[in-house]
Amino acid sequence: LVDAPGVPVVHAADYLTHRDTLLAAGHITVVGSGQSGAEIFLDLLRHRPTGREQLHWIGRTPAFAPMEYSKLGLEHFTPDYTRYFHSLPENVRDRLTDAQWQLHKGIDAGTLSAIHDELYRRTLNGDWPDTVLTPGVRVRTAGRIATTRIELHLEHIQQNTRTRLTTDAVVLATGHRERPLDRILAGLDPYIRRDNSERPRIDEHFRLVLDPSVTATGCNVYVQNAERHTHGVGAPDLGLAAWRSATILNTLTADEPYHLPTRTAFTTFGLEHQPHH
């Protein structure tokens, strides 16, 4: 669809390049309920005539929800939480990764307020804006109708219902796919220990868990931003980069050139082994 002539289907990263073409389209659908999707929907809304907006905004998340910015909430991005997450069973970690979407896929509260204010302003004349905002929806398939329209096959995750949406343009604010490590680590593949989902196992020091025949030689492979499944939501967070790097260097040198604090959060994640009396 992206390469189809006459059918504007663009990724959010290219939105500004194609903005004029999108604004000229009759009906526009924004797919994606994160910050990019929200900003694009707001921009389109502000530049469409009142009562003739013809905008759909859909996303897979259960709600158009704000990003978790509270100070205690942000303690999920600390070494304390990273260590706690790593200690959990694999199936629990996987459930948490999906459940914690609001820690990194939410929307700035100011943007949500601006969208609501703009929609409300358009009701002051007694009408209702021609917009549809529906969370909890995934796009199953998509195809062209004739040469200038697009049909999206939608499924509501909670209702388990399906429908079709015909639109003139689509903006895909769906993020970027993480690149798999397989090609980079192809030479090591026979030696990499994997979890139940065939993902590389990574220890608490950010080392790939390799066959003992490799580690016995003193060889190790360290990774950063490839360990969300083992270290949690903070894996790609730049705020933890210095701590990750220091952890790796301390392990490499078998010394402690970088002194790291033993506690970094006021929250105690999990029950302590020795209860307080």
Feature annotation, model-predicted:
Residues 1-35, 39-277:
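Flavin (primarily FAD) cofactor-binding/catalytic cores of flavoenzymes
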